[in-house]
Amino acid sequence: MVYAASRYVSQLTKDTLALVLAGGKGTRLKELTEHQSKPALHFGGKFRVIDFTLSNCVNSGIRQIGIATQYKSHSLLRHLSQGWSHLNRDMGEFVELLPASQQCSSRWYQGTADALFQNIEFIKEQSPKYVLVLAGDHIYKMDYADMLAQHVQSGADVTIGGIEVPVHEAANAFGVMQINKSGRVVSFDEKPDSPSPLPEDPALALASMGIYVFNTEFLLNELQKDAHSLTSEHDFGNDIVPQCIADYEVHAFRFTDSLYGLKPYWKDIGTLDAFWQANIDLIEVTPKLDIYDDSWPIWTYQKQSPPAKFVFNNDNRRGSATDSMVSGGCVISGATIDRSLLFVDVRVHSYSKITESVILPNVEIGRDVNIHRAIIAANCSVPSGMNIGFDHDEDQARGFRVSPNGIVLVTQNMLENLREQAPWEHAIQRYSQPKHLHS
């Protein structure tokens, strides 16, 4: 059956409830997620990671959204209350927070399927025809209405979003699907050691994006069965999906093109290397992820900050930035920024140089500091004269974390521990730390 696209998609999205799983610990991000969940991480200069999934929902016409939260959720809840309270409940639009242990059970969420089961009454109250299950910790732009339309027209019970990735990247990282010519999923392996390649291209595998469309009644039945299974881990990838493939119609939606015919961009920023790379991707002349596209905006909350400022123009003391993104509230005072991304309210003092680095919000960098291929966590105060990213043995000896690809993570706790280990040296650095905004 062929439908008039605009009317059909509009009705589809109105009949859909989105449930965003936003409780991930993000343990591979090490100290970056020590005090917050992965979806709450800062990204792209002014956003939070979860903003991309939520913006996709709103831009797709899906305005009924539940967010299941769990791990260290304070900063996430604060961001959602500040930035995502604009939907109109009188029009049936909402972003509902669903913390663990406050629904039909007193226990923590035991897995992705259990997160939905504990909110089963919430799902029933909304009476949607379809439930769109999403991960809140991926970076991408996607029109979910296209996936919903395919789901209905194919007659599937479940549709799984999939993207082509190199086989070596899929190994031990993603759920991998095999599909037949009609798009039906015939096998699903969760994070296999040796992923099955696509028949038409042995270098690629079809990886699950963690996006699922369910017919609501079907989902409720499967959640009930899974909840009462003594052998289940209550996880979509390990339990629900394999069982559905064996018994029901499960189809794949292949995310083969992004909006407006661009090559799809989808990133799991679950490691330090991936987090750094996804941010650095944005500074390219033509980035694979276009955050400047007014037709598909990324919505967020950001405090009011003044414009970025660059001061001093002497030969050896020039405030400048090349091939970089510098956010509001930043002051570059006689320092050089190259191929880097600076979040809001970063201050870099004279004679310092930052290259190929990601500097998170509210960071102060002293004089004569050199930083290369690093992530400087929020609220750091980097003392004058420090070099980061040039000698990894020295970086590790100082307590900084070095990733497999050589990205150095620095947090304020690491800097404070270093100061305690060498109090005389750091007393001198504190004494020489700039006292003025423009120094």
UniProtKB/Swiss-Prot annotation:
Alpha-D-glucose 1-phosphate binds at residues 109, 175, 190-191, 208. Coiled coil: none annotated. Its EC number is 2.7.7.27. It catalyses: alpha-D-glucose 1-phosphate + ATP + H(+) = ADP-alpha-D-glucose + diphosphate. It comes from the Bacteria. The keyword ATP-binding applies. The keyword ATP-binding applies. GO terms for molecular function: ATP binding; glucose-1-phosphate adenylyltransferase activity. Pathway: Glycan biosynthesis; glycogen biosynthesis. Pfam families: Hexapep_GlmU, NTP_transferase. Keywords: ATP-binding, Carbohydrate metabolism, Glycogen biosynthesis, Glycogen metabolism, Nucleotide-binding, Nucleotidyltransferase, Transferase. GO terms for biological process: glycogen biosynthetic process. NCBIfam families: glgC, PRK00725.1, PRK00844.1. Involved in the biosynthesis of ADP-glucose, a building block required for the elongation reactions to produce glycogen. Catalyzes the reaction between ATP and alpha-D-glucose 1-phosphate (G1P) to produce pyrophosphate and ADP-Glc. Homotetramer. Belongs to the bacterial/plant glucose-1-phosphate adenylyltransferase family. This is Glucose-1-phosphate adenylyltransferase 1. The gene is glgC1.
